[in-house]
Amino acid sequence: MAQNIQEKISEIENFNNMKILNILPKNIMIEVTNKCNCKCIFCANRKMKRQRRTIDSNLVNKALTEAKMLKVKEIGFYVNGEPLMDNNLNNYIKKAKELSYEYIYITTNGILAKKELIQKLFETGLNSIKFSINSIERENYKLIHGIDKFDTVMRNLKEVYILKKEKFPDCRVYVSYIKTKYNNYSDRDIKKIFEEICDEVVIQNVKNQGGLISNIEKIKCEENKESITRKLPCFYPFKSIV
């Protein structure tokens, strides 16, 4: 049985199942750009000191080719930026598809995710798209994301999901929701908003992203206190290559 998105995330983030093996992870993630059109209060992107730019296309193609030679099976074209801001994204998906990657995916804030663009990405070979939408109300969305685009994002999500159901039933459309004390709606209310317009909703507590979220104590939910204060290893070296 295929894993749902929550199971895949839980497997990657399982701190109790980390082993040093003489094999590479099956998943790689390529940051095609570190540019972003949001300023989310829980995200380290706005604290980034690196130059804002898109990746060199030759480097992406080289990485995809070499990773496939090493038996990598899954590729995500995002890390800490908005992938739809890179005009070469469709070319990268095409290359990954040509190399027979089994699972190709992105996460987006959804602002630029118009159905015409996503249709093109699905046609090229994108297997799933995850919308990062971290509020269920317009004014609160503006507070969390630092931009007033709630209506735009919700419209894009609805249209992309309809597109998926009508033309791309094997593709998946997900929603992720990061909880802070400023958007701490009940899971029931969150799912009520999204569950009819996507395949699955993933709700997670805010993380400190390697200590880059200096105000984590001010924005975390009270019930999330232990997971924030415990010192845990980064799971990426064990489960993925970034």
Predicted regions and their residues:
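Radical SAM enzyme [4Fe-4S]-AdoMet core and its adjacent flexible, acidic
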Residues: 1-10, 31, 53-55, 119-242
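Conserved alpha-helical substructure of the radical SAM core
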Residues: 2-128, 139, 143, 147, ...
